[in-house]
Amino acid sequence: MTQAKVRLLSFDDYLAYDDGLDKNYELINGELLEVPPETEENAYRAFSLLLALSEFVDIRRIKVQKLEIEVFAFPGMPLNRQPDLTVLAEGHIEQMADINQMAIKRFMDPPLMVVEVVSPYSSQSEANYRRDYIDKRQQFEQRKVPEYWIVDPTAQQVSVLVLVNGAYQASVFEGSQIIQSAVFPELSVTANVVLSA
């Protein structure tokens, strides 16, 4: 018996969809594409950053995985993203309660910050690299997310992209360098701490 492909026309359709399997999906051109679960190492890196950030922002506003962000769908790219870590803006918790979803829709303000941990890759042409460095950068920039961190264990660096006049400006931090955050200037964490797992 063959199973029909599920067609979802909108982000709202996607949020309402439940196949009971607790899997992660991306919505591309109306079709669901299953994405693999995050590795334990990536989750650990996100949680360690959550602990550092919790000194400066209410921990309820820091979400590790499972939060959906509606983004602009460029050709061949998904309509949704599930960052490894998201820092919500003021009002997001109330707005998400109003829609009864762990989601930031396009009519809402963007999150203050998103963080992606890059899965291992051997060349910059591989999907893991392109997804975080190119595709998500383009979508988060278009969504006007003020700060986007790319935590890259393969390259042993943390890139901090800050939105300046509608475009991201990148700074790269390695080793014992203290990461400079525009959103959280008082944050004092080194690249080594964020990269360790």
Predicted regions, residues:
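Gly/Pro/Ser/Thr-rich low-complexity, intrinsically disordered segments predominantly at protein N-termini
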Residues: 1-197
